[in-house]
């Protein structure tokens, strides 16, 4: 009798900053009972490891060592969400060796499980190009800036909307034009523009696509 291995069911969610992909990914993971990995946190975790040891953020060898020793299950989203860590992460994220190490770790996470949800910038194009379902979540820069602005105010911090909008546009430019793994939808990704959608509406739209993919996956 022939034996066969069923490929893992991977939900790949990509999109620019503050598009709502993280919120959507967590909602999907909770609904389907799937493990979730926010791959953006892996770059932040590398940056924090360097900052904690007082090491240079410009040394690719040191950053790569930090990436290779990273424990994906020990990442604390609340701690890693600090603005200073995000700024530092943008420096290590452009290093090819760091990206290779983290992509390998992210890929291993996805392939070692029966099912999972991963969100980031290059899941459907680089990390898991064979994912069962790919979503590219986007929204206008103004809407994304407003969401980020409201998040900051909700934390009790002060924020400047114009500054947040300018920062998002600059980040989009950097993400879309970088040489290594530029931000772009996979050819077979489903586009989900959340500019005028509630979280619930976005989830229901995604759920319909995922349910269809699950049915096909199970044969």
UniProtKB/Swiss-Prot annotation:
Source organism superkingdom: Bacteria
Residues that bind ATP: 15-23
GO cellular component: cytoplasm
Record EC number: 2.7.4.25
InterPro entries to which the protein is assigned, alphabetical: Cytidylate_kin, Cytidylate_kinase_dom, P-loop_NTPase
Catalytic activity entry: CMP + ATP = CDP + ADP; dCMP + ATP = dCDP + ADP
Single GO term (MF): ATP binding
UniProt keyword annotations, A-Z: ATP-binding, Cytoplasm, Kinase, Nucleotide-binding, Transferase
Compartment list: Cytoplasm
CDD domains (alphabetical): CMPK
GO biological process: pyrimidine nucleotide metabolic process
Signal peptide: none
Record-stated family: Belongs to the cytidylate kinase family. Type 1 subfamily.
Protein name: Cytidylate kinase
């Amino acid at each position: 009798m022939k034996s066969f291995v069923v490929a893992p069911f991977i939900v790949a969610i990509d999109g620019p900053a503050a598009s709502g992909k993280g919120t959507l990914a967590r909602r999907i993971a909770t609904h389907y009972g799937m493990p979730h990995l926010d791959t953006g946190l892996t770059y932040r975790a590398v940056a924090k490891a360097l900052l904690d040891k007082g090491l240079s953020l410009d040394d690719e060898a040191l950053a790569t060592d930090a990436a290779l020793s990273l424990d994906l299950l020990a990442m604390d989203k609340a701690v890693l969400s600090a603005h200073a860590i995000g700024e530092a992460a943008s420096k290590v994220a452009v290093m090819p060796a760091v990206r290779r190490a983290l992509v390998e770790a992210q890929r291993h996470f996805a392939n070692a499980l029966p099912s999972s949800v991963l969100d980031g910038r290059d899941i459907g194009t680089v990390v898991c190009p064979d994912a069962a379902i790919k979503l590219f979540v986007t929204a206008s820069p103004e809407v994304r800036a407003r969401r980020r602005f409201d998040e900051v105010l909700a934390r009790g911090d002060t924020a400047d909307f114009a500054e947040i909008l300018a920062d998002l546009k600059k980040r989009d430019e950097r993400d879309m034009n970088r040489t290594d793994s530029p931000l772009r939808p996979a050819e077979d990704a489903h586009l989900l523009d959340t500019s005028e959608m509630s979280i619930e509406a976005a989830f229901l739209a995604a759920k319909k696509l995922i349910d269809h993919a699950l049915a096909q996956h199970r044969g």
